[in-house]
């Protein structure tokens, strides 16, 4: 944004030099990249009048001019411009003047035998145009009392100005305007702000006219003013100079006014030729519609290009025909020209995301789209429109016929709570309440003290006492800051900017502190080490995924692409894809694990719409003896894969159980008959199983691939509660083993049987293991024969047969009590 200091001084008084102002603005967040002192472009250039212009005696293309510079004797100047003639008021560079635009220092010199005492300048030589056809001509009716001959010509050229080229952060759309920067300067200097006077527009609805807004989110507000009887022509010099300082060229008085309002208020406007709009509409009822493009539509924009429109292109449509890219660029067919007598002035609000997509779909970026993409202030729409109408009537004449409006803007009010204690906690500085009550009102915020603490803010420390530290304000956000000031922390940032970041002292810790990892990070690293210890390689995947047809996935509101339109709900799908990729590349089976976050919609009872959890996932399987001439190929079986997971949990200190899951808890990625829930300490923490055969077939994977996924939160919570691991010495006494066999129903799980055996056998039982399963001849229908080996051992003595038999009999009794089993031994 280019800021004219001459224009800025009309809005707010300040005594800072350009360099001091640039430093002050930089410190409050508006970095000044360049200071352009336009005064140096024409220092020494004065106003002159050509009294006579005679042909040069020795050159056909030169003229010898006598120029009145306000002194007793006219100056003789040799000029080569074809438009040099008597009576012209012109800029004259006197001897000693340096013109940076052409890197020329003026001196008296003979030109073809005639002494020339200066140079009559063109705008190109003054740096105001790229190329000029002749010398510049000031208006013949110039007030010579206000600007006598020989006086400084820079005010007449708009070169009595300094321009600051500054950048603002993306959230400060209000700063892309002169009024926005003037507010900042007023706050910095504590001087009052002088806004341009605006006469509120009073107009009736446009007769026999329709306005249609297809999507109120894409266009929350639209206003159009019909003005008849305008006379399009050149703009006055003051308007041209303001546009030139901002890097814009003058078009005509109507278009220049719309550009001036864009610079002054940050509100883009567009003027349509009303008669041309009616021609486009034909015999249809005059209708302006705001909608997205349809297939096959085209538009010839003001830059002369005929553009094929895309579904993302947001349009202004007249009678069904596109006439402008909304918020980006107008159409050539309805542009304002010297023949225009009636205009339709558009002032609207367009959604930032919609405008960005629309502009990018056509490869365009304009001053208007740049502002819409950041978010034009809701509150300035009516002010900017009325100011534009006022200037058009003043500079181009005409009268207002009518006004059409559509307005679904959100409420232009917001109230926040600000706690002094929170401000001090964030900034680390003892700030007085008086400082807050001086700085925030200077930025336009209204404050009133209260004692209630903001409910959405973190609670105050228990040690905090009432009084100054407990001071709380209710803050009303000005309408022009609604887009970027939404929370208490935003108010703290606003205070810090104006208070001055350079005023905060550097405070070193009073005592040296040893850095350490958090308990959660320490335990997570321990889990990583254990997983690497069982032979798995850690992998990472992006949390984004395609939404596809899965309604349970949490969707991204503004996705980068369809491939990244949702966030993952599990780690296992990504691990399967990683296994497939490595398998396809000939890298062999991937044995890997991943620790990452997963996301899901929260249950209706939860106050939050979404929930996030950290999971541990893994994938393993394939041939255990690849390319080994000594052994035959041997795929990993279910028990080997399960054993690796069990050993990992045991190294972490957990005794795990694997129980059948109900259908609703099963994963569709796993074999329905070869998956189980993982339980520790009475809670289900995840699942384990073999990949579904259909999935392996679709992805051309080996059948023997296994996956698991575990919720880390219960694991970490349990690990964090534990103290030091207590070592139990090995028993030096011999063990006694007993076998037990029985018929059991097929639906009875081994895990449930083992659980009852351990409870019945008591502390003497060291281990229990299934060593035989048989189905077939001799076994009752619907049952199977199971055989378990129980090992008994005491830490302090050799067990007697009586003790072992007593425990074994208790096991038999409890099995018959809990299950419909038939004992065989």
Curated annotation (Swiss-Prot):
Query: What are the protein's GO molecular function terms?
Result: ATP binding; magnesium ion binding; phenylalanine-tRNA ligase activity; tRNA binding
Positions of disulphide bridges: none
The listed locations are:
Cytoplasm
Residue limits of the tRNA-binding domain? 39-154
The UniProt note on the cofactor reads as follows:
Binds 2 magnesium ions per tetramer.
The record ties this protein, via SUPFAM superfamilies, to: Anticodon-binding domain of PheRS, Class II aaRS and biotin synthetases, Nucleic acid-binding proteins, PheT/TilS domain, Putative DNA-binding domain
Cofactor(s) recorded in Swiss-Prot or TrEMBL: Mg(2+)
Q: Which reaction does it catalyse?
A: tRNA(Phe) + L-phenylalanine + ATP = L-phenylalanyl-tRNA(Phe) + AMP + diphosphate + H(+)
Q: Which GO terms describe its biological process?
A: phenylalanyl-tRNA aminoacylation
Return the EC number. 6.1.1.20
Keyword tRNA-binding part of the UniProt annotation? yes
Question: GO cellular component terms?
Answer: phenylalanine-tRNA ligase complex
Tell me, what's a Pfam family for it? tRNA_synthFbeta
What the entry lists under PANTHER family is as follows: PHENYLALANINE--TRNA LIGASE BETA SUBUNIT, PHENYLALANYL-TRNA SYNTHETASE BETA CHAIN AND LEUCINE-RICH REPEAT-CONTAINING PROTEIN 47
Q: What family does the Swiss-Prot or TrEMBL record give for this protein?
A: Belongs to the phenylalanyl-tRNA synthetase beta subunit family. Type 1 subfamily.
Query: How does the record describe its quaternary structure?
Result: Tetramer of two alpha and two beta subunits.
Name of this protein: Phenylalanine--tRNA ligase beta subunit
Q: Which organism is it from?
A: Synechococcus sp. (strain JA-3-3Ab)
Tell me the classification of the organism that encodes this protein.
Bacteria, Bacillati, Cyanobacteriota, Cyanophyceae, Synechococcales
């Amino acid at each position: 944004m280019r800021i004219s200091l001459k224009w800025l001084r009309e809005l707010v008084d300040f005594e800072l030099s350009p360099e001091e102002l640039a430093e002050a603005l930089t410190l409050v967040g508006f970095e000044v990249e360049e200071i352009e002192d336009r005064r140096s472009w024409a220092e020494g250039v004065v106003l002159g009048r050509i009294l006579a212009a005679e042909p040069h005696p020795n050159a056909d293309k030169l003229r010898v001019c006598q120029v009145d510079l306000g002194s007793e004797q006219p100056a003789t100047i040799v000029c080569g411009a074809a438009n040099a003639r008597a009576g012209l008021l012109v800029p004259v560079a006197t001897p000693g003047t340096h013109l940076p635009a052409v890197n020329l220092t003026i001196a008296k010199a003979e030109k073809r035998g005639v002494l020339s005492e200066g140079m009559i300048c063109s705008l190109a030589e003054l740096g105001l145009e790229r190329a000029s056809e002749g010398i510049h001509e000031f208006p013949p009716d110039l007030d010579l009392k206000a600007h006598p001959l020989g006086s400084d010509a820079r005010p007449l050229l708009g070169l009595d100005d300094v321009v600051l080229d500054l950048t603002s952060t993306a959230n400060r759309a209000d700063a892309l305007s002169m009024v926005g920067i003037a507010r900042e300067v007023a706050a910095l200097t504590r001087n009052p702000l002088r806004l341009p006077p605006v006469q509120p527009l009073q107009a009736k609805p446009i007769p026999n006219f329709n306005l249609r807004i297809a999507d109120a989110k894409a266009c929350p507000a639209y206003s159009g003013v019909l003005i008849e009887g305008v006379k399009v022509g050149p703009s006055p010099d003051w308007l041209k100079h303001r546009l030139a300082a901002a890097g814009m060229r003058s078009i005509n008085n109507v278009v220049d006014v719309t550009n001036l309002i864009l610079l002054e208020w940050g509100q883009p406007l567009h003027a349509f030729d009303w008669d041309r709009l009616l021609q486009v509409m034909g015999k249809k009822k005059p209708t302006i519609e705001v909608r997205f493009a349809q297939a096959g539509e085209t538009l010839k924009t003001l830059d002369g290009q005929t553009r094929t429109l895309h579904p993302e292109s947001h349009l202004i449509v007249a009678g069904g025909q596109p006439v402008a890219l909304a918020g980006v660029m107008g159409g050539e067919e309805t542009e304002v020209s010297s023949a225009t007598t009636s205009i339709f002035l558009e002032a609207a609000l367009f959604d930032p995301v919609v405008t960005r997509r629309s502009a990018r779909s056509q490869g365009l970026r304009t001053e208007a789209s740049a502002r819409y993409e950041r978010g034009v202030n809701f509150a300035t729409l009516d002010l900017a429109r009325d100011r534009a109408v006022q200037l058009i009537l003043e500079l181009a004449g005409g009268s207002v016929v009518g006004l059409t409006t559509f307005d679904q803007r959100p409420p232009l009010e917001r109230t926040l709570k600000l706690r002094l204690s929170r401000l001090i906690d964030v900034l680390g500085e003892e700030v007085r309440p008086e400082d807050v009550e001086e700085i925030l009102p200077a930025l336009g915020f209204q404050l009133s003290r209260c004692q209630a603490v903001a409910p959405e803010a973190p609670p105050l420390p228990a040690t905090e006492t009432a009084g100054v530290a407990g001071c709380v304000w209710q803050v009303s956000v000005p309408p022009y800051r609604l887009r970027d000031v939404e929370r208490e922390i935003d108010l703290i940032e606003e205070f810090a900017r104006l208070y001055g970041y350079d005023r905060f002292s550097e405070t070193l810790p009073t005592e040296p502190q040893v850095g350490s990892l958090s308990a959660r990070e320490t335990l997570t690293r321990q889990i990583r080490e254990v997983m690497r210890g069982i032979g798995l390689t850690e992998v990472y995947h992006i949390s984004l995924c395609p939404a596809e047809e899965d309604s349970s996935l949490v969707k991204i509101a503004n996705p980068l692409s369809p491939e990244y339109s949702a966030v993952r709900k599990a780690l296992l799908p990504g691990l399967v894809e990683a296994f497939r990729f490595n398998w396809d590349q000939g890298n062999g089976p991937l044995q890997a694990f991943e620790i990452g976050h997963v996301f899901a919609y929260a249950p209706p009872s939860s106050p939050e719409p979404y929930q996030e959890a950290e999971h541990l996932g893994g994938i393993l399987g394939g041939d255990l003896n690849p390319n080994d001439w000594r052994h035959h190929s041997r795929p990993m079986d279910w028990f080997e894969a399960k054993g690796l997971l069990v050993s990992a949990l045991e190294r972490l200190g957990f005794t795990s159980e694997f129980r059948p899951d109900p259908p609703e808890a099963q994963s569709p990625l796993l074999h329905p008959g070869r998956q189980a829930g993982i339980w520790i300490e009475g809670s289900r923490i995840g699942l384990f199983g073999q990949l579904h055969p259909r999935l392996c077939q679709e992805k051309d994977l080996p059948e023997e691939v296994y996956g698991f996924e575990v919720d880390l939160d219960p694991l970490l919570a349990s690990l964090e509660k534990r103290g030091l691991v207590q070592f139990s010495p090995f028993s030096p006494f011999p063990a006694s083993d007993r076998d037990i066999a029985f018929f059991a129903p097929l639906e009875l799980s081994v895990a449930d049987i083992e659980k009852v055996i351990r409870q019945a056998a008591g502390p003497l039982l060291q281990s229990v293991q299934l060593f035989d399963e048989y189905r077939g001849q001799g076994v009752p229908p619907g049952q199977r024969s199971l055989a378990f080996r129980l090992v008994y051992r005491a830490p302090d003595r050799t067990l007697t047969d009586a003790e072992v038999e007593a425990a074994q009999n208790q096991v038999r009794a409890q099995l018959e009590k809990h299950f419909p089993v038939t004992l065989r031994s």
